[in-house]
């Protein structure tokens, strides 16, 4: 086969082991997954009710425009419906963005380490990837990213809060950054974890009307607890949305996914409860880190913590796994002596912390 040259050296995404597989290998009767930043509280009771009662005509294609969901989300953010695009998770939106803006003559700027799909999709398109190392505290080096932009740059990625460090860039700094980015360079502000930020930032969706080169990406996979439904969305100027719709598959979000997302976004009381629970979980890890001088906890603003214990990441990962907790080794994330741990329920956090204390 005459494969694209840009695929040479690239690997496919390797999902972690299934919980059942880990239990069988290690002889465990219970395993707690804290590796994929899923919501430990599940999803809204209203979503659960819909799942129990809903019937979907599986022989009928879904609404390709996601009309009902579009209306609800537009109303929630006080946006125009044409300022939204819905995709099969943010992963698909990232793919669409790289498809319309990158090729072998272009480059893209991003932090490192950050969400790996930016780099992966850019390389698939044959583009040059310009990675700017994070600052010592895990924050984006925004000045360094600005300096990396040239006439061939078409996309700049800003993951906020950043995955895997958890650092959050406040709105004033985002606006100052946007003021300096050339108007023909798209800034992707990936806010997959924005609902977890405490206190919640000022509403800023309408920045897209000031900055015509901005797209804000969000998801129903994290705090809304709909990871398996695969519903993400972008907020941008109508001209950007129009270009993305040219390459968007016609029926890319499912009927059930659209229905579940509608119920999920309506239940903001559940979202507030999740945010409070998550903030309390972060406090548990902060208290743990303060007790041990050798432990470095990166600023946590998502639903996960990145903890550097000064011990080889694989050792920490294996130790926790053998004791019934699946986490994410920092070795694959650019942090060789750290692990990323999803914030769980209070008792789960306490159990992991107790194990880490024994390891130290």
Curated annotation (Swiss-Prot):
Subunit structure: Homodimer.
GO MF entry, a single one: histidinol-phosphate transaminase activity
Pfam families reported for this sequence: Aminotran_1_2
Pathway linked to the protein: Amino-acid biosynthesis; L-histidine biosynthesis; L-histidine from 5-phospho-alpha-D-ribose 1-diphosphate: step 7/9
Gene name as annotated: hisC
Species the sequence originates in: Listeria monocytogenes serotype 4b (strain CLIP80459)
GO annotation, biological process: L-histidine biosynthetic process
NCBIfam families linked: hisC
Keywords: Amino-acid biosynthesis, Aminotransferase, Histidine biosynthesis, Pyridoxal phosphate, Transferase
N6-(pyridoxal phosphate)lysine PTM positions: 222
Enzyme class: transferase
Catalytic activity: L-histidinol phosphate + 2-oxoglutarate = 3-(imidazol-4-yl)-2-oxopropyl phosphate + L-glutamate
InterPro entries for the chain: Aminotransferase_I/II_large (IPR004839), HisP_aminotrans (IPR005861), HistidinolP_aminotransfase (IPR050106), PyrdxlP-dep_Trfase (IPR015424), PyrdxlP-dep_Trfase_major (IPR015421), PyrdxlP-dep_Trfase_small (IPR015422)
Cofactor(s) demanded: pyridoxal 5'-phosphate
Keyword Ligase assigned: no
Protein name: Histidinol-phosphate aminotransferase
């Amino acid at each position: 086969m005459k494969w694209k040259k840009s695929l040479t050296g690239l690997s496919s995404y390797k999902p972690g082991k299934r919980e059942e597989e880990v239990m069988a290998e290690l002889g465990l009767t219970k395993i707690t997954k804290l590796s994929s930043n899923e919501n430990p509280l599940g999803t809204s009771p209203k979503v659960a009710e819909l799942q129990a009662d809903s019937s979907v005509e599986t022989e009928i294609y879904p609404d390709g425009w996601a009309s009902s969901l579009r209306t609800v989300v537009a109303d929630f953010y006080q946006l125009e419906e044409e300022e939204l695009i819905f995709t099969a998770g943010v992963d698909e939106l990232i793919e669409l963005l790289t498809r319309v803006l990158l090729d072998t003559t272009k480059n893209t700027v991003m932090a490192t380490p950050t969400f790996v799909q930016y780099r992966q999709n850019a390389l698939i398109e044959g583009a040059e990837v310009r990675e700017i190392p994070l600052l010592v505290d895990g924050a984006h080096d925004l000045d360094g990213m600005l300096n990396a932009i040239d006439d061939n740059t078409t996309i700049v990625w800003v993951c906020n809060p950043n995955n895997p460090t958890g650092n959050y860039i406040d709105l004033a700094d985002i606006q100052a950054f946007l003021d300096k980015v050339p108007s023909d360079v798209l800034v992707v502000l990936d806010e997959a974890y924005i609902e977890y930020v405490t206190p919640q930032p000022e509403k800023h969706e309408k920045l897209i009307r000031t900055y015509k080169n901005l797209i804000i990406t969000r998801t129903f996979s994290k705090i809304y607890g709909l990871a398996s439904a695969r519903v993400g969305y972008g907020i941008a100027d109508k001209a950007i949305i129009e270009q993305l719709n040219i390459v968007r598959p016609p029926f890319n979000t499912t009927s059930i996914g659209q229905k579940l997302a509608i119920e999920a976004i309506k239940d903001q009381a559940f979202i507030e409860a999740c945010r409070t629970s998550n903030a309390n979980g972060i406090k548990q890890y902060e208290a743990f880190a303060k007790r041990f001088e050798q432990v470095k906890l990166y600023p946590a603003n998502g639903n996960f913590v990145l903890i550097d214990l000064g011990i080889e990441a694989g050792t920490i990962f294996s130790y926790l796994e053998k004791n019934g907790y699946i986490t994410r080794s920092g070795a694959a994330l650019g942090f060789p002596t750290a692990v990323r741990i999803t914030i769980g329920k209070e008792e789960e956090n306490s159990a992991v912390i107790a194990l880490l204390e024994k390891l130290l």
